[in-house]
C-alpha cells in the first residue's frame, strides 16, 4: 500500500520522524552473500543529520540494528529486518505546524487523504524515512559489487544557480567526500557551501541537482515495455522527498540536437560488450542496459520548511502566518547523495535478479 518497493529484491519501510524509529524489511536477497556491516553503517553515516554546518542540527547517531536474516554476517535468504531508533526528536519544536499547513509540504495533502496525520516531524513525509532506503540500498550495493563489480556513485552537480562542470567518468568516492556539500569540483564546492550558508542566514532554503553514474552495469537489465530500466529508475528517485525532476543521458538537452548528432555510434569491441562513441543514451537503449555507464540526474526543490514568514491557512481554512521552528536542512542535496545511490542500487539489484530468473536458465 505504498510502503514497499521492488519485485524480487523487495523492501518495505516503516516508521516516522518522531516515532520510536525507522526500519526496513528486505526480502529476496540471495543467500550466502557475506555482508560488511561497517559499510551499511558507513552509508547511514553519510545520510545522518548534524554532520556539517550546512545540514540540520538534529543529532542522531543512526546506529543500525539488524534483527534477522543473517548468520555470521552472511545472508540466509530469509527476510532481513533492520531498524534505527530515534533519539533526538523534539515534538515541541513543531507546535506551529500543528495548527498551520506548511506551504509546499505534505501537511495539507496528507490531511486531505487520511483525515489524520503525524504533524510532528512530518511523519512519513519526513526525509527521515529514507534511513530505511539507505540501509537496504547498502545491501544492494554489496550484492552488485559481488555479482558484477558494479559501482553506483552520486554527487551534487548544482546548488541554486551554481552548476559544476563534472566528467562523470572521472569522479571517485574520495572526490565526492572531500567536502561537506559532496560536489567533486572542489572550487565550485566552496562556492556552494557559501551560497547555502547565505541563504540559510536569510531564513530561506535552496534546491539543486544530483548526478549519479553506474559504472560496469551488466548488459541486458530492464524489462520492456512497462518496466524499462529508466522507468523504474525514475520511479525510484521520484519517490524521494523533495524530488521534482528526472533525466537520463542527454536528458532535456537532447531535444536541441538532431538525430545525427544525438545517435550513439557503435564501436568494435574485443570484450564482447557493446561500445559507443558517445553516451547520449545514458547507458540504456530500448529500456535495457547496453553496457555503457548509466548517467542520471535528479532535481530537488528547496526545503519547504523555512524560518521566513509565509502566508498559509490552518485546518479550518483560516488565513494565518507561519514561521517554522524546528531543525531543518537549508538544502537537502548533500545528505540526499547517498539516498539517490541507494534507490539506484535497489533498482539494479531487483532487475539483476529478474534478468537471472528469466534469461539465464540456459
Curated annotation (Swiss-Prot):
Keywords on record: Amino-acid biosynthesis, Aromatic amino acid biosynthesis, FAD, Flavoprotein, FMN, Lyase, NADP
Cofactor(s) this protein cannot do without: FMNH2
Protein's GO biological process: amino acid biosynthetic process; aromatic amino acid family biosynthetic process; chorismate biosynthetic process
Binding site for NADP(+): 47
Disulfide pairings: none
Top-level EC class: lyase
The keyword Flavoprotein belongs to this UniProt entry's keyword annotation: yes
Reaction(s) catalysed by this chain's protein: 5-O-(1-carboxyvinyl)-3-phosphoshikimate = chorismate + phosphate
GO MF terms held by the record: chorismate synthase activity; FMN binding
EC code: 4.2.3.5
UniProt family annotation: Belongs to the chorismate synthase family.
PANTHER family with a match to the protein in the record: CHORISMATE SYNTHASE (PTHR21085:SF0)
NCBIfam families on file: aroC, PRK05382.1
HAMAP family: Chorismate_synth
Subunit structure: Homotetramer.
Role according to the record: This reaction introduces a second double bond into the aromatic ring system.
The protein, known as: Chorismate synthase
